[in-house]
A protein has these predicted regions:
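Conserved mixed alpha/beta catalytic, RNA-binding, or beta-rich assembly cores of soluble enzyme
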Residues: 118-123, 129
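Terminal, membrane-proximal amphipathic helices
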Residues: 1-99, 127-235
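Hydrophobic alpha-helical membrane segments of integral membrane proteins
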Residues: 111-119
């Protein structure tokens, strides 16, 4: 009978093979449509979104109230940590879905407000997950790792491969800086067509709830696998 850790190693191999594949032709076509839609968004709105992401990155890098007290239970098994993170992920997915439905119902003005709100929810989840896996988020290097995990979840094919290399070797070749312009560009461009449709009155509510739920699901899977890999590499 295989151990939990051995099972996770196999899951990681399968996940990596799937996750690192280039996007499908349909996905690339959707991105082209999305780019056209983004061009219709006023420059002032684009500036607000860019500034929100920049400030978030700077706040996290410098230290912020996102930081959680270090977990006292240091002897948790990987299985226990995974279970606790899954519970936390379910909590945040529900919060994100409810928030997306609420802002989506309000049309363009409230829909635009969803971008910084969802960004905050994602970052809070990442800090909680890092703490549950036993990492100290008061350490600047760990906060930079969090930003790398975020980028991995919401980046283009080429940038995703570049970020994965940094994450794989993090504990031996730590990065000490963050290109926030690349960060915000990749994140903004990743946000799919559904998030743009959230700005449309009436259909915005169900679209917003679904999109936010799926984006948190993706972030949760990426986060779990990045921290699983780090813990297993230490053993």
């Amino acid at each position: 009978m295989i151990t939990y850790e051995e099972r996770v190693i196999k899951e990681l191999e399968q996940w990596k093979a799937t996750f690192m594949k280039d996007s499908s032709m349909m996905t690339r076509f959707s991105k082209k449509v999305q780019t056209k839609v983004q061009q219709l968004i006023p420059a002032k709105v684009q500036k607000v979104l860019t500034e929100t992401i920049r400030m978030m990155v700077q706040t996290i890098s410098a230290g912020s109230n996102f930081i959680k007290p270090k977990l006292k239970e240091t002897n948790w098994s990987l299985q226990r940590r995974d279970d606790e993170v899954r519970k936390k992920m379910d909590e945040y997915k529900k919060i994100a879905a409810a928030e997306g439905a609420g802002t989506g119902a309000g049309g363009i003005l409230l829909g635009l407000a969803d971008f910084p709100l969802l960004l905050g929810i994602k970052i809070k989840f990442l800090f909680d997950a890092a703490t549950l896996y036993g990492f100290d988020t008061s350490d600047k290097e760990e906060r930079l790792f969090i930003l790398h995990v975020f980028q991995l979840a919401f980046s283009s094919d080429d940038h995703r491969k570049e970020i994965w290399k940094a994450i794989e070797t993090w504990d031996t070749e730590k990065e000490n800086h963050m290109d926030w312009e690349k960060f915000q560009t990749e994140y903004r461009d990743y946000i799919d067509l559904a998030k743009m449709l959230q700005l449309v009155p009436i259909i915005g509510a169900p679209v917003g709830a679904y999109a936010n739920y799926q984006l948190l699901q993706r972030l949760g899977e990426v986060t779990m696998n990045c921290y699983r890999m780090r813990l297993l590499n230490k053993d």
